[in-house]
From Swiss-Prot:
Residues 212-235, 341-350 have a biased composition (Basic and acidic residues). The lineage of its organism: Eukaryota, Metazoa, Chordata, Craniata, Vertebrata. The keyword DNA damage applies. Pfam families: MUM1-like_PWWP (PF20884), PWP3A-B_C (PF20886), PWP3A-B_N (PF20887). Keywords: DNA damage, DNA repair, Nucleus, Phosphoprotein. The modification Phosphoserine is found at residues 105, 165, 168, 170, 355-356. This is PWWP domain-containing DNA repair factor 3A. GO terms for molecular function: nucleosome binding. It comes from Rattus norvegicus. GO terms for biological process: chromatin organization; DNA repair. The PWWP domain mediates the interaction with nucleosomes. One of its GO terms (cellular component) is nucleus. It is found in: Nucleus.
């Protein structure tokens, strides 16, 4: 374990692939036992941790596949979408690293001498078990003798039961011949035989075309995991036409030429099949059936290419290794061609009618191989990426989740879950608005009233909200979309409320915050959250709760009563009013009254109670009567307007300054702001305006 470069360790309750950075040895209590600690870095992350060597495993491809299968079998996502994407990206990087190491390992590249580590074990053992007991020439090496014997024995085993009738010597010799263009595979199996055309030029050309086509096709099959049975069947039928024309006796010597490629000149001096048992016409006819029976009894009869006109399917692992098995096959091509020509010249009557079939077979085989190669290349280009699990809608509500909530008579509106109380089955949510306070308390509602933001009814809820609040709901959706995009691309990591309070969301927020008057939001979040919904189904009972009256107006009237008592009963503002009339104190209200030519029909009196206002006005009228000669010339002509525009504001400002113990400027600013209205009062006022507008439209 200490030698592994990549390991699988546990971090944050999950198995993560990691890269080993360093190894440290620490002394344990028992001196004989030594503990090793590994400094590892989580793949695709910058997180570095230290783990015990006994708590990790060497990273293997099977581990990644098991984890992926486990994730695919889960119904619920165990973590947030961002954490899940991070974890799967780390697994993807680990899988790429393992594939890269596999492709760069020496086992995947063929050795030039024709022997690979896989060839030196199992294939040699198979060939050794299948070598005939007949003597072989002395100039052949042990490996070459095994290959030659395999050539004979395998060709005899590949015959079907229908072709086991007594054969002539030329037909038996035909089972030993091998085209040097095809050669032997690494596992010792013979390649497909290529028939020789009659013409001098067509023989070499067609053979080379088929050779390149087979090599490219087998390379594609080695890379891809599957085959097309239909295409393979067509190619086999095309090859069977070419295989049926190989009936010359001189071609039997190619088996020895392939078995000993180092000494081709010595091979042709004596009997061409002297060292191979399968090439003896006398012995082979009697040994075919016993060999077949013995192999069937052992269960080792394998499907190989047949030379009697048919062909069994070629296994997937036989293909590109043909080149490495016979390094000097090109040197034998000239001699084999000469022998074939000599054999064909002995029987000219058979060669002429077969030439047309051979040329047709070569063309069909070549075209089929090219089509198969093109289709497999298209499959590689259209290879789908690794499967990614779709995001399933969570069944429970968590903190920070985006939801829909129906509030009073307003449509469903997006909100954020601030807290969840599982025992009470309630959640505190905060509606998404233009002036939303991320630190606000929100309202408490039942979990049954919440809907996930990405629920099936999402589009219907959006359409319903757009009927009355098109611009507002569009802004909310754009804000949520921008948050998810930044979360996915990694430019922001945090909850939605943190995103709303951060500067990164300002470009989206300012479009609404700078246009408060033009965008109308529903009045949400400060009423009774458990009020029954307006669109509840008929017959469905909902608890009816009594709405308490608004106490903010009563509180303001009680505070204003102190001002009235200060003005009327205590007469505390009378000296201030006389100083203004005698021009001892400046007054913006008197200056505006004298310079204004317009008659104001509406004014802010600050006092909301009519009785309080009448009491103050009567007192000010008495003051005017007492100071009739001291009033300004213009004020004497319009006494009511002078009282409302000058004396009433000055008296109230003086009372605010005295009662609340503030200076005159602060009291004047409070008077200009007017009474502070509550949220419910604004809502009632807006509802009255909407009802009035709807009534006029009707």
């Amino acid at each position: 374990m200490t030698d592994a470069k990549y390991v699988l360790c546990r971090w944050e309750k999950r198995l993560w692939p990691a890269k080993v950075l360093a190894r440290t040895e620490t002394s344990a209590k028992n001196k004989r036992k030594k503990e090793f600690f590994l400094d590892v870095q989580i793949l695709s992350l910058k997180e570095k941790i230290q783990v015990k060597s006994s708590a990790v495993e060497a990273l293997q491809k099977s581990h990644i596949e098991n984890i992926a299968a486990f994730l695919a079998s889960q119904n619920e996502v165990p973590a947030t979408p961002l954490e899940e994407l991070t974890y799967r990206r780390s697994l993807r990087v680990a899988l790429d690293v393992l594939n890269e190491r596999t492709s760069l390992s020496p086992e995947s590249h063929p050795v030039e001498n024709g022997s690979t580590p896989s060839q030196k074990g199992k294939p040699d053992a198979d060939m050794a078990s299948q070598v005939s007991s007949a003597p072989s020439p002395s100039f052949l090496s042990e490996d070459d003798q095994a290959v030659a014997a395999q050539c004979a024995s395998k060709r005899r085993w590949e015959c079907s039961p229908k072709s086991l009738s007594p054969l002539s010597a030329s037909e038996e010799d035909l089972r030993c011949k091998v085209d040097p263009k095809t050669g032997l595979s690494e596992s010792g199996a013979l390649g497909t035989e290529v028939p020789a055309p009659t013409g001098d030029e067509s023989q070499n050309g067609s053979g080379s075309q088929l050779d390149h086509g087979q090599e490219s096709t087998t390379k594609k099959r080695q890379r891809n995991s599957g085959e097309k049975p239909a295409r393979r069947g067509k190619a086999e039928s095309g090859l069977s036409k070419g295989d049926s024309v190989a009936e010359s006796g001189g071609q039997a010597s190619s088996c020895v030429a392939l078995a000993s490629p180092r000494l081709p000149s010595q091979t042709w001096e004596g009997d061409p099949c002297a060292g191979v048992e399968g090439c003896d016409p006398v012995e082979s006819s009697g040994n075919i059936r016993p060999l077949l029976d013995s192999e069937r009894s052992k269960g080792r009869l394998t499907k190989r290419p047949r030379l009697d006109g048919g062909r069994n399917p070629l296994p997937r692992h036989l293909g590109t290794r043909t080149v490495g098995a016979v390094p000097s096959r090109r040197s034998c091509s000239g001699e084999v061609t000469t022998l074939r020509r000599a054999g064909d010249s002995d029987r000219p009557e058979e060669a002429d009618p077969m030439s047309s079939e051979e040329s047709t077979g070569f063309k069909s085989v070549h075209s089929l191989l090219e089509e198969e190669e093109e289709e497999e290349e298209e499959e590689e280009e259209e290879e789908e990426p690794p499967r990614i699990l779709l995001y399933h809608e969570p069944r429970s509500f968590e903190v920070g989740m985006l939801v829909w909530l129906k509030y009073q008579k307003y449509p469903f509106w997006p909100a954020v879950v601030k807290s969840v109380r599982r025992r009470d089955k309630k959640a505190s949510v905060l509606f998404i608005e233009g002036n939303m306070n991320p630190k606000g308390r929100g309202i408490t509602v039942s979990l049954r009233r919440l809907k996930h933001f990405d629920c099936k009814e999402k589009h219907a809820l959006l359409d319903r909200a757009k009927e009355d609040f098109a611009q507002a709901i569009g802004w909310c959706v754009s804000l949520i979309t921008d948050y998810r995009v930044r979360l996915g691309c990694g430019s922001f990591a945090g909850s939605f409320l943190e995103y709303y309070a951060a500067d990164i969301s300002y470009p989206v927020r300012k479009s609404i915050q700078q246009d408060v008057l033009g965008t109308r939001f529903p009045q949400l979040g400060k009423g009774d959250p458990e009020e029954p919904m307006g669109d509840s189904r008929l017959g469905q009972w909902r608890p009816c709760r009594k709405v308490l009256p608004d106490r903010s107006r009563a509180a303001r009237d009680k505070a204003n009563q102190k001002l009235v008592e200060y003005i009327v009963k205590a007469k505390g503002a009378e000296s201030h009013l006389r100083a203004i009339l005698h021009s001892r104190k400046p007054s913006r209200w008197l200056k505006t009254f004298l310079s204004s030519n317009q008659y104001v029909t509406c004014m802010e009196t600050y006092l909301e109670d009519e009785a309080q206002l009448d009491e103050v006005v009567e007192y000010l009228q008495g003051v005017c009567r007492d100071m009739d000669g001291e009033m300004p010339a213009r004020g004497s002509g319009d006494r009511i307007r002078f009282i409302l525009d000058v004396l009433l504001p000055e008296a109230i400002i003086c009372a605010i300054s005295a009662v609340e113990a503030v200076d005159y400027k602060t009291a004047e600013q409070k008077y200009l702001r007017g009474p502070t209205l509550s949220y419910r009062e604004k809502e009632i006022f807006d509802n009255e305006l909407l009802e009035e507008r709807n009534r006029r439209r009707r």
